[in-house]
Each structure stands twice: as C-alpha cells, then as structure tokens.
A protein has these predicted regions:
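An N-terminal assembly and electron-transfer interface module characteristic of large anaerobic redox
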Residues: 1-195
Length: 195
C-alpha cells in the first residue's frame, strides 16, 4: 500500500480518496496506478482499527452485514473527515480471471455491491460535507468494456477520452501489471502458505 503519490502541485486533477476495504485490497495497485497516471493525488484510508470501525457505526443499516463490510463505513468516514472531496469505490461483479481452471471469478454479492449501500446510507453525510462519491459498476474483467465504461464515467473531465483510458490500461498492463499485481498476489500466496 505504500506507493509514491503525486504532490499537490503535480496533481493536475486534484485529490481522489480510495477506501482500504474489501476488494480494494487486491485491486488497489491497479487503481493507484490508474488515477496517478490520470493526474490525481491518491489518498488511501489507513489500516482498519477499532476507532475506524466505531466511527462508521451510525451509518450501518443492517446488523447482518459481515464485519469487513461494516468497516467500509468507517473508512469512508475517515476519508471525508480528512477533507477528501472525491471518493472512488467501484462496484465490481467480476475480478480479473487469475486462474483459468477456477470455476468463476465472481465477487460475493456484498463485495460486488457494497458501494451502492454506502451511497444510499451515507448520501446525506456526503451532501453535508460536499463530497462526490463515485461508485460506478466497472467491468474489471473485460479490458475493452472497462475502457468504454471508465471513459463514460469520466466524461465530466475534459481530456479523459477513450484513447487516454486505453493507453493508461495498456501502460499499466505492460509496466505495472506483472510487477504490482503479480508480486502482490505472490505476497498473499506466500503468507497463506507460511501461516
């Protein structure tokens, strides 16, 4: 998670916050590279702790959600309390297919759709704090659809077009994909094997 960020002067598009939660643990290397190349300074919420959990409790609508999902509320609140005005937390049904022999690469329904829960449960909080909460449905497992959807999503940013998004994705795949994602996955696998 310790990745170099653009300085405030270098960040031509400003700051974007990413919560350190659920599937963002695995996907963060990609999103950090993606937003950095677009010119955003990326701010990541800190590691989970009791204070973060308790700070978000007032917006948890269901006691039946799993503990990791409940943590999301506190991470979002931390970003808002640290004056982050744009937060990105996408809904992702399918992850990148890492193992061709696996029967699927589908996220559990809570992981896939929890950004929608956050949007509904924290809408007033976002409004009161003038925060833009970005939670698009992203086809993370299909490069061409990903490029199309992310370009549509960012159509409010003047010069983020299809080619820009495609080039960032291509650059990430070549430069960082094997290094960041592969090494990160290996670290996880190594920990699982040794523990």
């Amino acid at each position: 998670f310790d990745r170099p960020c653009l300085s405030e002067e270098e960040a031509s598009r400003g700051v974007i916050g990413i919560p350190r939660v659920l599937n963002m643990y695995e996907d963060y290397p990609f999103w950090h590279a993606f937003f950095t190349k677009l010119g955003f300074r990326v701010v990541l919420s800190p590691a989970s702790n009791k204070e973060i959990y308790e700070s978000g409790m007032d917006s948890i609508s269901s006691d039946t959600a799993c503990y990791p999902a409940k943590l999301v509320h506190g991470h979002i609140k931390w970003l808002v309390e640290n004056d982050i005005k744009r937060i990105f937390y996408p809904s992702i049904n399918y992850e990148v297919e890492e193992d061709k022999t696996a029967p699927n690469h589908y996220n559990c329904p809570i992981v896939a759709t929890y950004p929608e829960v956050i949007d509904k449960n924290m809408a007033d909080y976002f409004y009161d704090n003038m925060v833009e909460f970005y939670h698009p449905f992203v086809p993370y497992d299909d490069d061409s659809r990903f490029v199309r959807e992310m370009t549509k999503f960012f159509n409010h940013e003047r010069d983020i077009d299809l080619d820009s998004t495609r080039n960032i994705l291509k650059t990430y795949d070549l430069e960082a994909g094997a290094r960041d994602y592969g090494l990160f996955s290996m670290e996880i696998s190594d920990k699982e094997i040794t523990e």
